């Protein structure tokens, strides 16, 4: 088990930034025995985390299709090879705000031998990110497709084929190009993605995913949430997400609830809005 109630947000956010930063997908192969005591699972382990598994499909589609455009600019700093290999001298001054909006990285230098072209570093990104954060409280990527609201702890993905509203979104409204998202839960990860190479606007089928927190039955944490006191047992309990999503396209949709195998279980409640949007509850 993994004592982190908000871990569902990890996969779609990492997938989005892999596109922005042009990171190559990495496969972690490992063996793991079953254990009896409480332990903290690895970040990439979806086997025992149902909310992560539920979002693996949309996260994979985003990465494979390249839904998020690559940043064409970035901010870089130099670091010596000796400093890079030291746990004491390895220090960088890349602002966190810049990391949210564009590529960042280092150029290794040693005896005038340099790996990477530091002249490609866009120094203006530091002031640009700082000004944006100060004036709006939000950080929007240079591509315009990713937005982090630092104050309200929310994250938006807004591309042609995948859109999402993630984080502590309860009581707020995520306004995206093809979807308006409103959730009553304090924390949720809600994504809408095309199931083809077409955009959401033109897709024949869409996948709407809505997950939140989870825990084992009778699982207990310390008051600060940093320590698991009781691991609990099966069945795993997943929080039901309540609210609605307005799909703002010209299509007429049927909406179905799916089980863990992707099979239809029942029709979801829908309602046509005056502006032509289809509201799914």
Say what each PLM segment does.
Residues 7, 15-18, 24, 56-59, ...:
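Generic serine detector
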Residues 1-102:
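Catalytic-core region of carbohydrate-active enzymes that cleave or remodel glycosidic bonds
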């Amino acid at each position: 088990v993994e004592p982190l109630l908000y871990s569902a947000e990890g996969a779609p956010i990492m997938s989005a930034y892999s596109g922005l930063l042009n990171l190559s997908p990495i496969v972690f192969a490992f063996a793991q025995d079953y254990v009896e005591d409480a332990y903290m699972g690895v970040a990439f382990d979806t086997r025992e985390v149902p909310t992560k598994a539920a979002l693996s499909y949309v996260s994979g589609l985003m990465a494979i299709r390249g839904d998020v455009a690559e940043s064409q600019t970035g901010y870089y700093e130099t670091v010596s090879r000796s400093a890079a290999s030291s746990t004491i001298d390895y220090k960088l001054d890349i602002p966190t705000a810049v990391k949210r909006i564009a590529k960042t990285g280092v150029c290794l230098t040693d005896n005038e031998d340099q790996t990477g072209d530091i002249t490609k570093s866009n120094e203006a990104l530091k002031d640009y990110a700082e000004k944006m954060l100060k004036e709006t409280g939000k950080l929007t990527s240079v591509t315009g497709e990713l937005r982090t609201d630092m104050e309200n702890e929310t994250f938006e993905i807004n591309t042609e084929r995948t859109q999402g509203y993630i984080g502590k979104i309860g009581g707020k409204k995520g306004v995206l190009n093809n979807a308006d998202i409103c959730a009553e839960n304090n924390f949720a990860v809600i994504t809408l993605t095309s199931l083809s190479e077409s955009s959401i606007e033109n897709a024949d089928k869409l996948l709407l995913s809505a997950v939140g927190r989870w825990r084992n039955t009778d699982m207990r944490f310390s008051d600060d949430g940093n320590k698991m006191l009781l691991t609990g047992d099966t069945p795993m309990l997943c929080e039901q997400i309540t609210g609605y999503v307005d799909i703002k396209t010209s299509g007429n949709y049927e909406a179905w609830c799916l089980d863990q195998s992707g099979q239809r279980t029942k029709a979801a409640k829908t309602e046509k809005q005056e502006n032509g949007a289809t509201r799914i509850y």
